[in-house]
Amino acid sequence: MKKICFIAQFPPPMHGLSKAVETLYNSNLNSEIDPHGKFKFEKVDITNNRNFIKNLLKISRSKADLFYFTISQTKGGNLRDLVIFKLLELQHKKCLIHLHGGYYRQLVDNDMAGWQRKANYKAIKKLSGAIVLSKSLKKIFEGMIDDDKIFVVENCVDDQYLLTDQEIEEKLKALENEKVLHVLWLSNFIRSKGYPFVLEMAKAEKERVDAGGEKRFHFDFAGKFFEESEKDYFESYIKENGLEEYVTYHGIVGGEQKRELLKKCYIFALPTRYPNEGQPISILEAMGNGMFIITTDHAGIPDIVEDGVNGIVMNKEYDAVNCYRKLLNEHELFLFIVRNRKKIKKFYCQNEYIRKMKDFFED
């Protein structure tokens, strides 16, 4: 039985990368999870750099046939990765990397000293392959490794967070009578991911209602604050603009609480310009659970969301007020919801993701 060693970031904390890794590791490919699994998985959790030496010893002692490595997009993390690459090279180990983001090439070409840049080009060239999240992100590794060794495996929606067909039917039926539509922000609270933009949309809604209009939207936020300054900004903006009746913060959600939010909300907003962005799983989850998408033409997002087809895809010239007005005038939510649901079930379900990864592990 083929042995595969995961060198990756496992939860906690939970984010797009760790979620994808956990889904794959706990899949039916793993013989410890499923007796019919085709592979023996082992893991080296590189989330905590304090375990660096211990992790190097684990890697050096591993008898795995293939090392599956989710690489970093920071200079410090990359130094760790270079040491791991060198160790695998010295031991003549096969290594397949998976980039869960879109910033790596910019990091290497623009942010690194010459020696570190050269070390990356040299290390990547010797790999068995490099996986990216979408077609438009293949350019990240072009010129670093042979084109036929650059592969695409899109993210997926975990089965546990995908509403059933019956639940979607009920959601569509309820839409006919919904006077106030819920807009969902579900991500980590990082300024460049765009949560201030969504707060501005909430402010625009309040101003319209104050001028005599009926309330049309309520804004639901969920996710983790990594910095106290982000939490202060969020809470201060709500208080200063009197948005208490327009904004609800649900904290960090998971399990049934998350499913209920996905069921309740009809619009998903992630106007991100986050430098490390790849292909946000949260957007796929929203589409799969029957939501109209508001996002940007950033990183690998245009590969999954098309303006006017799946929602609103904004360039850098858009502002929150213009986006809000466009949403206000959108009267075909039903069609977007049905279209987005079909797309995810066909191309981005958990089984499809695992099937693609199985093919690479077998090769």
Locate each region found by the language model.
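Acidic donor-binding loop of glycosyltransferase active sites
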Residues: 263-277, 291
